[in-house]
A protein has these predicted regions:
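A short glycine-rich beta-alpha junction/loop motif
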Residues: 1-6, 135-143, 175-202
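Non-catalytic DNA-recognition/assembly elements of restriction-modification systems
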Residues: 2-65, 194-205, 209-238
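Generic alpha-helical structural context detector
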Residues: 41, 55, 114, 158-162, ...
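Sequence-specific dsDNA recognition surfaces
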Residues: 51-65, 76-111
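Short Gly/aromatic-enriched secondary-structure transition segments
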Residues: 69-71, 128
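A short beta-sheet element
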Residues: 102-104, 108-162
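Short amphipathic beta-strand starts and helix->beta connectors
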Residues: 128-130, 173-177
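Periplasmic-binding protein-like
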Residues: 166-169
Length: 238
């Protein structure tokens, strides 16, 4: 049976408040994304190719040859990388289980970016942090960038690459058959980006991290909307 009309009205009113809050959260996210885009577009500095700013691009697995085979490392599936710029989940695996296979190797502080469609266009990329023993392996469909800390801040580099503008340019140069198109590493190697002073880079990096944290909080609030509505129903109907 339907609840009394006054109860129905209260349920609708409270649920509409949640819908309004979700709409406001989405608007805030869009505004923050515009702020980030504008911040990166306004960066001034000498233009330099990424290959000159990295100590390694798609680093060799030989880096870990001397490590114990039984040592646990982080394994990252493509599905475990969000479209929002972070790793959502890792699985600890022995180094021996992942080193000899076709998985991509990376380390703490490296940048991983999906190279295959549609993952790249969707924004699957991350700054690899919190890796088990500082080592990660993952999908063969990642490109990996290791910033030269003397030349560029890794968060600044990630902030510059994790943008729709860069993804649009990357999509234009994809090669391969439909459904298996990939961004060639040469696109990133030859990509020129502005490199301000290290102090300026660090300021931008800190601001970027703060803005991304704000986006993450807002998205969490949006994700909780359904459970909040269910709580309203439970309050009035149980």
């Amino acid at each position: 049976p339907l609840p009394p009309m006054d109860v129905q009205k209260k349920i609708v009113e409270e649920c509409e408040k949640i819908d309004k809050a979700v709409a406001e959260d989405n608007e805030q996210i869009r505004n923050i994304e515009v702020t980030i885009s504008k911040m990166m577009l306004e960066v001034e500095g000498d233009a330099q190719k990424i290959q000159k700013l990295c100590s390694a691009i798609n680093p060799s697995k030989s880096d870990v040859n001397s490590l114990e085979k039984s040592m646990l490392v982080s394994f990252v599936e493509m599905s475990s990388v969000s479209n929002d710029g972070y790793i959502e989940q890792t699985v600890d695996k022995p180094l021996a289980d992942v080193r000899k296979r076709s998985y991509t190797y990376f380390a703490e502080g490296d940048i991983i970016i999906a190279k295959i469609t549609p993952c790249m266009e969707n924004g699957k990329c991350a700054l690899a942090t919190g890796l088990k023993n500082g080592i990660g392996f993952g999908s063969s469909e990642f490109h990996v960038f290791r910033a030269n800390a003397k030349l560029i801040n890794n968060v600044y580099l990630f902030a510059y690459l994790n943008r729709k503008e860069i993804r649009s340019k990357a999509a234009e140069v994809m090669t391969g058959s439909s459904g298996h198109r990939r961004v060639p590493i040469s696109f990133y190697e030859d990509l020129e980006i502005p490199v301000p002073s290290m102090d300026k880079q660090m300021l931008i990096a800190e601001k970027y991290k703060g803005l991304m944290k704000d986006i993450e909080s807002l998205k969490q609030q949006i994700a909780n909307a359904s459970s909040r509505k269910q709580a309203i129903l439970d309050k009035y109907l149980k």
